């Protein structure tokens, strides 16, 4: 059978591999398609163990299912739910509209995932290995989940529109050729942006981004010794609170509460400058227990920031400056030992 012919009647295409045929049938049934072996070392998508043809599907077959797939079986709702699957070649859904629910767990992509101007309902990639996610102007009606994924060459979400929540908890993101780990200028998130215990190697760029509820960087590590900023987010708007505070190591993460005695915590750490100039925060900016590591030329810049409350309760930065020129803060919560030394605080 030629590609596309007869598939609307549910007939299985002739040229599918055994792994792809199983995925096709699971899609029609709306069931999870699990190709993991049961061996944790072998199944680690970020490990070095090879995954052979028995657990490999071609990206174009995945795209075929998502863009123009067969009908669901009677009484079922079609969906793509993969576990432990290797996806070969480039997954290119650029400009497409994807109606089925998509959830991939512990999967491995050989090449970048291309989603620019793609429309989804909800899409979840959990604990996946992805060379790069290219998703400028992506639109989702619901959530975009990327927790525990690892991206070797960055994420691009410029001008993306996320209908509800964006989750980046425990993701590891390395920089692209331009030095950015996450490029999300102009992005809009309808509800929460959670990047708790995110590990970023490069610049996180959120210029003019908008978050409908809170932005949580609890326990995150933003590391950018390469260029000026680890977080570059002028004109950022957060309707409630920006958290750069600790997270609990374990489940659930701390959410602004006092941890039980003996609970291990991971503080928010930033190596590189932070630029929040002209930001608008509806409830608070919270730096409790934050650790900033700057060079002499770098700074925590809060020029013209507007917030009802600033919780400046982090560690004193040994180098660099803190700049609050033109900031409008109603209530300041601070400690004397949180501010930088003489000559390194600028408020005029």
Regions from the PLM with identified roles:
Residues 1-348:
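N-terminal leader/targeting and pre-domain segments
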């Amino acid at each position: 059978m030629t590609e596309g012919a007869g598939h609307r009647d549910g007939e299985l295409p002739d040229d599918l591999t055994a792994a792809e045929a199983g995925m096709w049938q699971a899609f029609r049934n709306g069931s999870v398609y699990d190709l993991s072996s049961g061996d944790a070392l072998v199944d680690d998508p970020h490990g070095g163990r090879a995954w052979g043809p028995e657990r490999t599907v071609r990206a174009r077959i995945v795209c075929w299912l998502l863009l123009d797939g067969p009908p669901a079986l009677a009484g079922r709702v079609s969906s793509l739910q993969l576990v432990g699957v290797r996806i070969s070649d480039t997954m290119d859904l650029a400009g497409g509209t994807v109606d089925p629910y998509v959830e991939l767990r512990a999967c491995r992509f050989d090449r970048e995932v291309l989603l620019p101007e793609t429309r989804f309902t909800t899409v979840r990639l959990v604990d996946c290995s992805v060379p790069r996610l290219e998703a400028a102007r992506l639109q989702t009606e619901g959530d975009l989940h990327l927790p525990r994924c690892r991206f070797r060459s960055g994420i691009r979400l410029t001008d993306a529109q996320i209908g509800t929540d964006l989750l980046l908890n425990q993701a590891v993101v390395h920089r692209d050729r331009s030095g950015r780990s996450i490029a999300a200028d102009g992005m809009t998130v309808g509800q929460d942006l959670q990047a708790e215990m995110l590990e970023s190697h490069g610049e996180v760029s959120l210029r003019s981004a908008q978050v409908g509820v809170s932005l949580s960087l609890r326990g995150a590590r933003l590391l950018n010794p390469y260029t000026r900023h680890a977080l570059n987010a002028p004109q950022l708007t957060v309707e409630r609170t920006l958290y750069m505070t600790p997270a609990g190591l374990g489940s659930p993460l701390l959410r602004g509460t006092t941890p039980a005695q003996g609970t291990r915590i991971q503080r928010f750490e930033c190596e590189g400058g932070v630029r929040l100039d002209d930001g608008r925060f509806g409830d608070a900016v919270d730096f409790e227990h934050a650790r900033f590591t700057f060079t002499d030329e770098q700074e925590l810049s809060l020029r013209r920031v507007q917030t009802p409350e600033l919780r400046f309760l982090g560690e004193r930065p040994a180098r660099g400056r803190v700049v609050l020129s033109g900031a409008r803060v109603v209530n300041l919560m601070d400690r004397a030992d949180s501010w930088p030394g003489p000559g390194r605080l600028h408020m005029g």
